[in-house]
């Protein structure tokens, strides 16, 4: 018989940097989960990633206080900022340009994010990435 799911918890944790301090410790502790068990397992699974890459994680919490977690790909804004070599997006997107990304970079980001997007084709994934780029004040060239 399958375990009874009591809830889900979504966090965004830097790769290889999960520790019991806030925000992870309190979020897991108030649900009665073993904080160190999560931190060790998360850090082990993300050790291949570049340090401080934000990794979204969805934790499934069961009635017996056990849990499983699923790692997602880093946010699209993280990839776009890396591609454009900027620290943050434009404060006035549409008026001020924060930088530029090429169509090749957009395709590469779409291929990385494809498994987390709700689309079937690479073209529709590219349109999603282009929309995110525009909302950050980035120009798409090519």
Curated annotation (Swiss-Prot):
InterPro entries, alphabetically? Ribosomal_uL11, Ribosomal_uL11_bac-typ, Ribosomal_uL11_C, Ribosomal_uL11_C_sf, Ribosomal_uL11_CS, Ribosomal_uL11_N, Ribosomal_uL11_N_sf
- Which keywords, in A-to-Z order, does the entry hold? Methylation, Ribonucleoprotein, Ribosomal protein, RNA-binding, rRNA-binding
The record's Gene Ontology cellular component field reads: cytosolic large ribosomal subunit
Q: What is an example of a Pfam family matching this protein?
A: Ribosomal_L11_N
Record's superkingdom? Bacteria
Q: Which SUPFAM superfamilies match?
A: Ribosomal L11/L12e N-terminal domain, Ribosomal protein L11, C-terminal domain
**What biological-process GO terms show up in the record?**
translation
What PTMs does it carry?
One or more lysine residues are methylated.
One GO molecular-function annotation for this sequence?
Answer: structural constituent of ribosome
Q: Which family does it belong to?
A: Belongs to the universal ribosomal protein uL11 family.
The record's annotation in PANTHER family points to: 60S RIBOSOMAL PROTEIN L12 (PTHR11661), LARGE RIBOSOMAL SUBUNIT PROTEIN UL11M (PTHR11661:SF1)
Describe the task this protein carries out. Forms part of the ribosomal stalk which helps the ribosome interact with GTP-bound translation factors.
Q: How does it assemble?
A: Part of the ribosomal stalk of the 50S ribosomal subunit. Interacts with L10 and the large rRNA to form the base of the stalk. L10 forms an elongated spine to which L12 dimers bind in a sequential fashion forming a multimeric L10(L12)X complex.
This protein's name: Large ribosomal subunit protein uL11
């Amino acid at each position: 018989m399958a375990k009874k799911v009591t809830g889900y918890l979504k966090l965004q944790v830097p790769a290889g940097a999960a520790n019991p301090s806030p925000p992870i410790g309190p979020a897991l502790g108030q649900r009665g989960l073993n904080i160190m068990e999560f931190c060790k397992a998360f850090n082990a699974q993300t050790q291949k990633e570049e340090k401080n890459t934000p990794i979204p994680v969805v934790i499934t919490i069961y009635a017996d206080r056990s849990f499983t977690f699923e790692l997602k790909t880093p946010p699209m804004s993280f990839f776009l900022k890396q591609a454009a070599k900027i620290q943050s997006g434009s404060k006035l997107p549409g008026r001020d340009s924060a930088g530029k990304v090429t169509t090749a970079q957009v395709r590469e980001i779409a291929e990385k994010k494809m498994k987390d997007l709700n689309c079937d084709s690479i073209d529709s994934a590219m349109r999603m990435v282009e929309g995110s780029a525009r909302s950050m004040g980035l120009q798409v060239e090519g």
